[in-house]
Amino acid sequence: MAIKTYKPYTPSRRYITGVSSEDITAKASVRSLLVKLPAHAGRNNNGRITSRHKEAGAKKLYRIIDFKRRKFGIEGKVEAIEYDPYRNCRIALISYRDGEKRYILQPKGLGVGDVVCAAESGLDIKPGNAMKLRNIPVGTIVHNIELKPGKGGQMIRSAGAYAQLMGKEEKYVILRLASGEMRQVLAECMASIGEVGNEEWSNVTIGKAGRNRHRGIRPQTRGSAMNPVDHPHGGGEGKKNSGRHPVTPWGKPTKGAKTRRKKASDKLIISRRKGK
């Protein structure tokens, strides 16, 4: 997939780039795999904003994705490659021999007509197949990795993401993430072979505010542009700096301050991510 540019018939359109849709083959989605999700726009059940800078965005339907990949021993053929408005990678429509159809994340190199399968072991190491981590050879690139057996893939699901299987220790395997983090995952967990497709997405330039509004992202107002009643950085004459380290509207340190809480799974992280 290539990055495409646009003719600058408006000033904002000059800098917009997008990913070519030449890989998309589907004319329509499978209706039984579509569901309407309510738009919360960052509000809780009381209607109060709990996550700022969010809105409904463009109208869209959610595609039900098979993250579990537990349909063992039944081969499926890739019927179509589709666009998914809820994620930045493409999805592949798989038609299984028993007649069932499911969506999976499209790994790099998977195309229409290819055959994929899921099993505990014994499959070829090719994009789209899924196996338990204990049966995948060391050095293999994987994605859509479970953290709890049977729960479905939770890690490595966005466009261009991947992890590499570095070793095996008793009931755990060691994975190296793209960030450089080394992490243990239970060997009974499932993972899909290959790197997630649409890797050019990271090079896309949004280009104008309206495009983010379609994605459901509202503008962010700087704290220094507010009044003192609204933000700790507010007030002052002209463009005066805040005179303090960056904080949130509620006075908590931000912009680089570590906020991650300690939890039991911390012991599974062998080495932290490396700075880029």
UniProtKB/Swiss-Prot annotation:
Do the record's keywords include RNA-binding?
yes
Give the top-rank taxon of the lineage listed in the UniProt record for this protein: Bacteria
Protein name, UniProt field? Large ribosomal subunit protein uL2
Q: Name one Pfam family in it.
A: Ribosomal_L2_C
Record key words, sorted: Ribonucleoprotein, Ribosomal protein, RNA-binding, rRNA-binding
Q: Where is this region: Disordered?
A: 208-276
GO: which molecular function terms?
Answer: rRNA binding; structural constituent of ribosome; transferase activity
Functionally, this protein is described as follows: One of the primary rRNA binding proteins. Required for association of the 30S and 50S subunits to form the 70S ribosome, for tRNA binding and peptide bond formation. It has been suggested to have peptidyltransferase activity; this is somewhat controversial. Makes several contacts with the 16S rRNA in the 70S ribosome.
Output compositional bias ranges, type Basic residues: 255-276
Share an example GO biological-process annotation for this protein: cytoplasmic translation
Q: Does the keyword Ribonucleoprotein apply?
A: yes
| Start-end of Basic and acidic residues biased regions | 230-240
**Could you tell me which PANTHER family the record lists for this protein?**
LARGE RIBOSOMAL SUBUNIT PROTEIN UL2M (PTHR13691:SF5), RIBOSOMAL PROTEIN L2 (PTHR13691)
Q: How does it assemble?
A: Part of the 50S ribosomal subunit. Forms a bridge to the 30S subunit in the 70S ribosome.
Q: Which organism is it from?
A: Campylobacter lari (strain RM2100 / D67 / ATCC BAA-1060)
The family annotation for this protein states: Belongs to the universal ribosomal protein uL2 family.
